[in-house]
């Protein structure tokens, strides 16, 4: 007697997102560590120098965290009101921050009391940065002004009053100590030169500007405001290169990867988008639990830190390369185990019998082997199977139909069991890969349970859903056939015109309108 042959489960190609190098790179982070702050995290900034600590601005405090620590190693709390935009100097030794009362404070990273206090703004200071020479600080405030401060003398050097609304973001050039950028709620981004008394360039963004970023080379400017991220060429007078609209809500922060090849943007829609700086297409996306206010990347992209409106600081560390642990050496079998039976000499009358390989059957195969057809169908109609592996359910239905026992397996079911069958049909009947098998199953179910329709509201509702699905599919197929008919007519007309033009233009190899002299 031949052995039982398991049901062949038809496999289908898995359609999903293409796995790229960016996907592998940006997914190579550990589970995020979440730190609760006292208020919304308005700014995160990494020190440019080892050990790459980062400053977190939240409420009226500035916390300094170690690269891998979950506890703050230093706190600056000498603020009367909310603190903003704590930023490291290029050497990582000083940190500057603005505040709600209009003051700008300079701190030594090794101390606690402010080294300098710059007073001059009349409203909240939301952006501060060090210039490239390390001896000046630029600040922008809600009083519409931009000021340049001298650190050694604690004095104001210049004041620019060209913005007509709140100045909420800015950055200084990393190459030129006299150039810096500011963005305002008046929809403009301006470039100022400390050697002049007015701006040297103004770019219209079209929305209140929330964040600006200058590429290390100084040639490209990125501005974020509203749902737009715009990239401008500063060497061509601020010419717009590309406008990106990949977020659903206001973009609040921008960041560059360590290599400068990827641009990151965070938004109130709780997403961080990663763009290629060559094609400006989204190559990856991160999802977070709350709206995002700030974003920063560590050296070599080893850590990504995101600050949110609910006061949560999300910290992701890159996975380290797995090291092979030196496990104790397994004891090998004895030598006699390998030579057992090797010295046996074959005889002419010996009969060689191969030990049959034991086949492990699935539970539904065991039921089919013992002709428990209803039980086999029940197993594959379990919600876990129908949702994760619907192809198994379809294969079993196809096998039962081949055996001619599908009607017997579907008959005699109660309200709950028939609901499972109808749910599966409703979910998968419109899929082209399953339709040939499931249409036949649907016809059998209708024939069996037609006499009892109207006795169960639950089953009646499922049948109505199935009817609506079939009608919608029929309308869809009719529209497709109409479209195919129109396309065939167009193609036929084009072929007829091409054939006619060839006949008109050629007659025995010569143009028709040309007379041939005899």
From Swiss-Prot:
Assigned GO CC terms: fibrillar center; nucleolus; small-subunit processome
Protein's GO biological process: positive regulation of transcription by RNA polymerase I; ribosomal small subunit biogenesis; rRNA processing
Record's subcellular location: Nucleus, Nucleolus
PROSITE patterns: WD_REPEATS_1 (PS00678), WD_REPEATS_2 (PS50082), WD_REPEATS_REGION (PS50294)
Positions bearing N-acetylalanine: 2
Role: Ribosome biogenesis factor. Involved in nucleolar processing of pre-18S ribosomal RNA. Required for optimal pre-ribosomal RNA transcription by RNA polymerase I. Part of the small subunit (SSU) processome, first precursor of the small eukaryotic ribosomal subunit. During the assembly of the SSU processome in the nucleolus, many ribosome biogenesis factors, an RNA chaperone and ribosomal proteins associate with the nascent pre-rRNA and work in concert to generate RNA folding, modifications, rearrangements and cleavage as well as targeted degradation of pre-ribosomal RNA by the RNA exosome.
Protein's UniProt name: U3 small nucleolar RNA-associated protein 15 homolog
Gene assigned in the entry: UTP15
């Amino acid at each position: 007697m031949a052995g039982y042959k398991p049901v062949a489960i038809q496999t289908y190609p898995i359609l999903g997102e293409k796995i790229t190098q960016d996907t592998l790179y940006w997914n190579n982070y550990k589970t995020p560590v979440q730190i609760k702050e006292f208020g919304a995290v308005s700014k995160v900034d990494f020190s440019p120098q080892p050990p790459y600590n980062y400053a977190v601005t939240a409420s009226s405090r500035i916390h300094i965290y170690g690269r891998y620590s979950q506890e703050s190693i230093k706190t600056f709390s000498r603020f009367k009101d909310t603190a903003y935009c704590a930023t490291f100097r290029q050497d990582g030794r000083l940190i500057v921050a603005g505040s709600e009362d209009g003051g700008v404070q300079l701190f030594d990273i090794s101390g606690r009391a402010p080294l300098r206090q710059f007073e001059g703004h009349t409203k909240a200071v939301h952006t501060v940065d060090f210039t490239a020479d390390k001896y000046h600080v630029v600040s922008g405030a809600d009083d519409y002004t931009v000021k340049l401060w001298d650190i050694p003398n604690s004095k104001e050097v210049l004041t620019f009053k060209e913005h007509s609304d709140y100045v909420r973001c800015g950055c200084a050039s990393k190459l030129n100590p006299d150039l810096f950028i500011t963005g305002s709620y008046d929809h403009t981004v301006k470039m100022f030169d400390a050697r002049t008394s007015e701006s040297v360039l103004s770019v219209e963004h079209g929305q209140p500007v929330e964040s600006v970023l200058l590429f290390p080379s100084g040639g490209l400017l990125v501005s974020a405001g509203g749902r737009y991220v715009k990239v401008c060429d500063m060497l061509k007078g601020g010419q717009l290169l590309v406008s990106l609209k990949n977020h659903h809500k206001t973009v609040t922060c921008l960041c560059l990867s360590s290599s400068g090849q990827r641009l990151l943007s965070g938004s109130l829609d709780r997403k961080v988008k990663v763009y290629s700086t060559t094609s400006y297409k989204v190559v990856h996306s991160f999802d977070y639990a709350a709206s995002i206010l700030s974003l920063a990347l560590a050296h070599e992209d080893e850590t990504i830190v995101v600050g949110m409106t609910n006061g949560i600081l999300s910290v992701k560390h890159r996975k380290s390369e797995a090291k092979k642990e030196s496990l104790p050496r397994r004891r090998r079998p004895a030598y006699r185990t390998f030579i057992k039976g090797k010295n046996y000499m074959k005889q002419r009358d010996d009969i060689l019998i191969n030990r049959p390989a034991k086949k492990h059957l699935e539970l539904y195969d065991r039921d089919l082997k013992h002709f428990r057809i209803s039980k086999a169908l029940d197993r594959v109609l379990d919600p876990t199977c129908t949702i994760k592996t619907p192809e198994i359910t379809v294969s079993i239905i196809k096998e039962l139909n081949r055996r001619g026992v599908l009607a017997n397996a579907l008959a005699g079911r109660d309200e709950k069991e028939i609901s499972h069958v109808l749910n599966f049909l409703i979910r998968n009947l419109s899929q082209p890969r399953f339709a040939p098998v499931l249409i036949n199953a649907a016809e059998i179910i209708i024939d069996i349970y037609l006499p009892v329709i109207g006795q169960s509201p639950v089953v009646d509702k499922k049948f109505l859903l199935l009817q609506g699905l079939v009608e919608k599919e029929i309308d869809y197929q009719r529209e497709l056939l109409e479209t195919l008919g129109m396309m065939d007519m167009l193609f036929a007309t084009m072929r007829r015109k091409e054939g006619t033009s060839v006949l008109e233009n050629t007659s025995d190899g010569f143009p028709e309108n040309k007379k041939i002299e005899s």
